[in-house]
């Protein structure tokens, strides 16, 4: 489901992290 992706995206937006700069640990 997109629960994990949703949480990760929320954290990225809050922290201002970019997938390129900080790849999420899958």
From Swiss-Prot:
GO biological process per UniProt: monoatomic ion transmembrane transport
Membrane topology of the entry: Multi-pass membrane protein
One Gene Ontology cellular component annotation held by this UniProt entry: postsynaptic membrane
Compartments in which it is found: Postsynaptic cell membrane; Cell membrane
Keywords: Cell membrane, Ion channel, Ion transport, Ligand-gated ion channel, Membrane, Postsynaptic cell membrane, Receptor, Synapse, Transmembrane, Transport
Catalysed conversion reaction: K(+)(in) = K(+)(out); Na(+)(in) = Na(+)(out)
Role this protein plays: After binding acetylcholine, the AChR responds by an extensive change in conformation that affects all subunits and leads to opening of an ion-conducting channel across the plasma membrane.
Assigned protein family: Belongs to the ligand-gated ion channel (TC 1.A.9) family. Acetylcholine receptor (TC 1.A.9.1) subfamily.
The protein's assembly and partners: Pentamer of two alpha chains, and one each of the beta, delta, and gamma chains.
Protein name: Acetylcholine receptor subunit delta
Organism of this sequence: Electrophorus electricus (Electric eel)
């Amino acid at each position: 489901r997109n629960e994990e992706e949703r949480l990760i995206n929320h954290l990225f937006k809050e922290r201002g992290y970019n997938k390129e700069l900080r790849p999420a640990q899958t």
